[in-house]
């Protein structure tokens, strides 16, 4: 399936090295969930990866974006917990600034109740940052 994604082709101090491109996304592997991305958080590690300053160095080219929320569009043959149409959230090292992604089913969680896609996508890093600030740094 053809999707649009933002690809970083080289290390850069700004986002000048990022282009919107069309790529081929494979069908999900047997234990993967394919998610139509509805929201993707922008976090400090995304910028650090683009600048080549993050401890993890993704292979070039790569799409930034580590936290995303969306709708399950397909599942691998061994996935039993999710079905197409489910509202879900996941965390990835990179790849989220895309129209769709494939990710391991064990990294996917249901979005509770009527929580918006935007809030679900930004919850993890924001929560952990606040928690560490209050419990580790604030004491």
Regions found by a protein language model. Name each.
Residues 8, 50, 73-74, 102-105:
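Short beta-strand-to-turn element immediately C-terminal to the catalytic PLP-Schiff-base lysine
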Residues 17-20, 95:
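Residues that act as N-cap/strand-start positions at coil-to-secondary-structure junctions
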Residues 20-25, 69-71, 100-102, 108:
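Conserved hydrophobic/aromatic beta-strand scaffold that supports enzyme active sites
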Residues 48, 87-139:
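NAD(P)H dinucleotide-binding glycine-rich loop of Rossmann-like/cofactor-binding domains
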Residues 12-14:
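Proline/serine/threonine-rich low-complexity linkers at boundaries of modular beta-sandwich domains
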Residues 24-41, 53-95, 115:
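Glycine-rich beta-strand-centered segment in the early N-terminal region that forms part
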Residues 45-51:
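Cytochrome P450 core scaffold surrounding the K-helix E-X-X-R motif
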Residues 1-6:
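Short structural boundary motif marking the start of a folded domain
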């Amino acid at each position: 399936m053809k999707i649009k994604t933002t690809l970083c082709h080289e290390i850069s101090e700004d986002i000048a090295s990022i282009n919107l491109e069309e790529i081929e996304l494979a069908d999900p592997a047997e234990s993967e969930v394919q998610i139509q991305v509805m929201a993707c958080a922008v976090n400090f590690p995304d910028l650090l990866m683009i600048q080549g300053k993050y401890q993890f160095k993704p292979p070039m080219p790569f799409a930034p974006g580590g936290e995303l929320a969306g709708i399950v569009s397909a599942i691998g043959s061994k996935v039993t917990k999710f079905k197409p149409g489910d509202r879900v959230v996941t965390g990835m090292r990179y790849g989220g600034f895309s129209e769709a992604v494939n990710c391991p089913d064990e990294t996917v969680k249901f979005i509770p109740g009527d929580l918006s896609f935007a809030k679900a996508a930004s919850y993890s890093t924001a929560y952990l940052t606040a928690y560490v600030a209050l419990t580790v740094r604030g004491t």
